[in-house]
Amino acid sequence: FNKAHEKGIKILLDLVPGHTSDQCEWFIESQKPEKNEFSNRYTWTDSVWEAPPQYKFVCGITNRDGNYLVNFFSSQPALNYGFAEITHPNWQLPPSHPDCQATVEAMKDVMRFWLDKGADGFRVDMADSLVKNEDGEKPETCKVWRNIRKMLDEEYPEAAIISEWSRPHTSIGAGFHSDF
């Protein structure tokens, strides 16, 4: 970062807030059968036999009695920011649930880590996809980003965030500086 900054170059990192690798320590802890602080960091069903067809789940490969939601590939478990519409109350949580809020705080910590190292901001992958079961203007996902933007404005006012959203009128209102 220092060499780039010496040359007047700003560095934006690619932030992927919707999922992690299945090798991430958060996920390794989350897949344990015993409840722990990471149990709800990802979205899990309550039984290995439950996998509603409207979602993409990986089934029966962990010690936990449940299946985990993915955004794309089996190696990319989806982080749990909650569900705007609860259709399966035994395992879906609202965005206001403390465990979903803990996911937001963890993502802020990831951002702080890189900003403290010298990054100048982030290009955010799939920024509109955090809260599940949400259509239209995505008000719950917008709340998440406004919360993150508040932290950035207070702690890193020079940091830039650019969304991959493809709806500038929504993403700018959610706190992004630009959208593509």
Question: Positions of the model-derived regions?
Answer:
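Conserved beta-strand->loop/alpha-helix structural units within folded catalytic cores of enzymes
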Residues: 1-16, 114, 119-121
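Alpha-amylase-like alpha-glycosidases and glucanotransferases acting on alpha-linked glucans and related
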Residues: 21-129, 143-180
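Short, flexible/disordered intra-domain loops and linkers
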Residues: 132-140
